[in-house]
Amino acid sequence: MASPGGQGGGAVSTRGAGARRMKWALELSLGNARGRGDRQSNQGDVMYPIGYSDKPVPDTSIQETDKNLVEKRCWDVALGPLKQIPMNLFIMYMSGNTISIFPIMMVCMMAWRPIQALMSMSATFKLLENSNQQWLQGLVYSVGNLLGSALAIYKCQSMGLLPTHSSDWLAFIEPPQRMEIMGGGMVL
């Protein structure tokens, strides 16, 4: 510390016309002034501030944040198939019920994605192993994929691709006749 008498080297500063003012300074190094190269060689000479500890303190807030991020990521994976259902409904509406290449391609993709996700479920569950709610997340993931498959089956049925009448299996039964045929607001 600089002495109050003004003999502390840089402790006294002069301003203006002879006005002397005292500056207080606290030197944390016990030795003389050293260069940068000397700092690493004499580490024992340094006085640390009050409350300083050389031991690393584990940061529990990072571990807590990591657990929350893992839970959030697992729920994102589990809810992924359910988030695709509104888009699939929109695609079903836009593709129509006619049998052509575009609607059939949409139905194939709608059916293949959930089946592929259900077949690779073990790889998905490896990601969910760190979660506390693994079983609930797995159930939500399975239900979402089953709903996606059900939408594809419904679209196939509405297009007339599923064998739902007995005439589809038996050759001697006549197919059902349409009672009324309409097209574009005109009677045919």
From Swiss-Prot:
It is a multi-pass membrane protein. It is found in: Endoplasmic reticulum membrane. Its main location: endoplasmic reticulum. Coiled coil: none annotated. The keyword Coiled coil does not apply. The keyword Flavoprotein does not apply. GO terms for biological process: protein insertion into ER membrane by stop-transfer membrane-anchor sequence; tail-anchored membrane protein insertion into ER membrane. The chain crosses the membrane at residues 72-92, 104-125, 133-153. Residues 93-103, 154-188 are lumenal. Keywords: Endoplasmic reticulum, Membrane, Transmembrane, Transmembrane helix. Belongs to the EMC4 family. Component of the ER membrane protein complex (EMC). Part of the endoplasmic reticulum membrane protein complex (EMC) that enables the energy-independent insertion into endoplasmic reticulum membranes of newly synthesized membrane proteins. Preferentially accommodates proteins with transmembrane domains that are weakly hydrophobic or contain destabilizing features such as charged and aromatic residues. Involved in the cotranslational insertion of multi-pass membrane proteins in which stop-transfer membrane-anchor sequences become ER membrane spanning helices. This is ER membrane protein complex subunit 4. It comes from Salmo salar (Atlantic salmon). The lineage of its organism: Eukaryota, Metazoa, Chordata, Craniata, Vertebrata. The gene is emc4.
